[in-house]
Amino acid sequence: MRLIPLKNDQQVAKWAASYIAQRINQFKPSAERPFVLGLPTGGTPLQTYQELIKLYQAGEVSFKYVVTFNMDEYVGLAQDHPESYHSFMHNNFFKHIDIQAQNINILDGNTDDHQQECHRYEEKIKYYGKIHLFMGGVGIDGHIAFNEPASSLGSRTRIKTLTEDTLIANSRFFNNDISQVPKYALTIGVATLLDAEEIMLLITGYNKALALQAGVEGSVNHLWTVSALQLHERSIIVCDEPATQELKVKTVKYFTQLEAQEIASVC
């Protein structure tokens, strides 16, 4: 596992966006051989999307031959609802770049057959071979996508009941009214994520410090989904200084020295 400890969330966004653009450009995607990118929603990746839009506008990256798969979607929320993840992705990223509509994949939370929709999603990922780079974030309890604590580390795309902590955290998007937050979501599984060729998690803020500590220094544990990254041969966590508050000083020092060149690139 790589840990890139940066100063603040702006540096995290710049580094992550630059890394994604670099990976796409190195791949040299085409219509016959697209780059497959996994994407999250939520507050943490917003700045990264803004930085990616800037890189696109500067002509430094194109998404014409990029296929995307999103991590999750609420169940029962209309796709045009302002807080659906379809709306989030369109408004904050897709409408600002040159991605082709047919290359965008987001779970359908309004289908009558959730099991079939989840199976279809897994099969479509297999159709493309694999996800080359999956960017994600974590919740304060260490969940990735909607793989809440005690999710199986071998899980696949499925419907999940959201925990009270997640409902409370997400209520900020619903006028702080927890009763308006959908209680269920369709989500990729932990094993689906681990199938990716490379995983990059963004972890920022004091409230994510325990999750970062569990993911980096803790044992692999189904109560902390983030810890599953320890099993992946190409995983990166990009974090800011506030998120490192629960890490041992020697851990931060070790990775700061190890990743000095990467840290210098955004300072």
From Swiss-Prot:
Active site: D72, D141, H143, E148
Sample GO molecular function, one term: glucosamine-6-phosphate deaminase activity
Entry GO terms, CC: cytoplasm
Keywords (A to Z) from UniProt: Allosteric enzyme, Carbohydrate metabolism, Hydrolase
Domain of life: Bacteria
Regulation affecting activity: Allosterically activated by N-acetylglucosamine 6-phosphate (GlcNAc6P).
SUPFAM superfamilies: NagB/RpiA/CoA transferase-like (SSF100950)
Keyword Hydrolase appears in the UniProt entry: yes
CDD domains (UniProt xref): GlcN6P_deaminase
BP GO terms, sorted: carbohydrate metabolic process; glucosamine catabolic process; N-acetylglucosamine catabolic process; N-acetylneuraminate catabolic process
E.C. code: 3.5.99.6
One matching Pfam family: Glucosamine_iso
Residue(s) at site: Part of the allosteric site: S151, R158, K160, T161, Y254
Record carries keyword Hydrolase: yes
Catalytic activity annotation: alpha-D-glucosamine 6-phosphate + H2O = beta-D-fructose 6-phosphate + NH4(+)
Similarity-based family: Belongs to the glucosamine/galactosamine-6-phosphate isomerase family. NagB subfamily.
Described function: Catalyzes the reversible isomerization-deamination of glucosamine 6-phosphate (GlcN6P) to form fructose 6-phosphate (Fru6P) and ammonium ion.
Protein name, entry field: Glucosamine-6-phosphate deaminase
Origin species: Haemophilus ducreyi (strain 35000HP / ATCC 700724)
Protein encoded by which gene: nagB
